[in-house]
Regions:
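Conserved catalytic cores of very large enzyme subunits
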Residues: 2-218, 222
Length: 223
């Protein structure tokens, strides 16, 4: 009863009124992810740097004692399951080529901020743990690594690799940041990159990702 009441309260507040804590932020994230899937044909709609934009809510609630690490891990495990639930119909050839019905929802953990400081945090570790717990192909978990990555984080990522699930994918900041700068990004924007879909490094919030736009702008052959 209390759980459902809290869920109803969360849904009444977000995303319209903005999240006030980690639990509400998780609910808001899930609403937005579903809306984007529906609006944009549901392919490669990637959560990006989940551990970064969710961390302020986590930190605030942990300091006030509203949440525990165990509760946060449970919420993240649930989000991972829900992300794997999302699907879209494909023809047989596409299903075979994509090794199933993956939606390539890339979620990346670790890395550095715009000032070049490593920002691996508790949620970075919990992201890996969530994939360990649910053992599902979605979200497509990735990790950012560089010479400032904590050794413990590399070990934890390697433990997930050892399971054979094919996660996480590893992305080297030392190579990707200069490559993005060579394409016109500022150093600050390049440091804040995330991965879209399979392997595409892009800057959060500054890349147009509306992949089905031609469905609306191009004339239909049937017209």
């Amino acid at each position: 009863g209390d759980v459902y009441k809290r869920q109803a309260q969360n849904c009444a507040n977000v995303p319209e009124k903005g999240a006030t804590g980690f639990y509400e932020a998780c609910q808001s994230f899930w609403f937005v992810q579903q809306l984007l899937q529906i609006e944009s044909s549901g392919h490669s709609i990637s959560p990006g740097r989940f551990d970064q934009y969710m961390y302020p809510y986590y930190q605030k609630d942990m300091e006030s004692g509203k949440i525990t690490r165990e509760f946060v891990q449970e919420l993240m495990d649930c989000i991972w399951v829900k992300l794997n639930d999302l699907n879209k119909c494909r023809d047989a050839a596409s299903a075979e080529g994509f090794a199933g019905y993956s939606l390539f929802q890339n979620l990346i953990a670790g890395g550095q901020n715009e000032e070049g400081i490593d920002v691996t945090n508790d949620l970075s570790f919990m992201s890996i743990q969530a994939s360990m717990h649910v053992f599902l192909p979605q979200p497509s978990l990735s990790v950012r690594v560089w010479n400032g990555t904590p050794h413990e984080f590399l070990i934890r990522a390697a433990e997930l690799t050892r399971t054979g699930i094919g996660l996480p994918a590893y992305y080297n900041d030392e190579v990707i940041i200069p490559s993005l700068m060579s394409r016109g990004l500022t150093l600050q924007d390049a440091r804040d990159y995330n991965i879209i879909g399979c392997v595409e490094p892009q800057k959060s919030g500054k890349t147009e990702g509306w992949h089905d736009c031609l469905l609306y702008t191009s004339p239909s052959p049937r017209d």
